[in-house]
Amino acid sequence: MKLFCSLFLVMILFNCQQDIYQVEEELIGVTLPENTKIQGFYLLNEGNMGTNKATIDYMDYTTGMYHRNMYAMANPTMVKELGDVGNDIKVYGNKLYAVINVSNFIEVMDLKTAKHITTIPLENCRYITFKDGKAYATSYAGPVSIDPKAPLGKVVEIDTISLKITRQEVVGYQPDELEIVENN
């Protein structure tokens, strides 16, 4: 009887699991090819908080094709989808930088292929900008929560060659977007 109850319990547990939904890359012809100065654009889909479903799409004006969820297909050995809450995406040089806020990292990819180059850990990162071979990213420097004792936020400097954090400066609570003005 114990064996029957154990098997019944195991069967119920396995039957209650939800199927894992994985978004595959999709190519969609949306327009005729265009000869413009802008070759295309990347679109960061943030996904729902807690679902690890941020994705990157690319609209290629030269072919008229829209590439949906290109990161997962370009990186089959990585965890599917990009992470939890895509917050910002920028191009600098031949690299693509995606700030994945709740997953606490900046994903660095090859600009043409979206293949993973490295991941830069940064707690509750928000936005990124660039100047003279350096990336500057904002961070809340603490978990995503309502906490009256939350730490002060910071801005980090990342070398775009080594892809390592080289400096950081505490700036106050919840720094978000940032701009570089007149070489300062």
Ranges and model annotations:
Residues 12-15:
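C-terminal motif of bacterial Sec signal peptides marking the signal peptidase cleavage site
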Residues 17-184:
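Predominantly soluble domains enriched in secretory-pathway, periplasmic, or organellar proteins
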Residues 1-7:
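Sec-dependent signal peptide recognition
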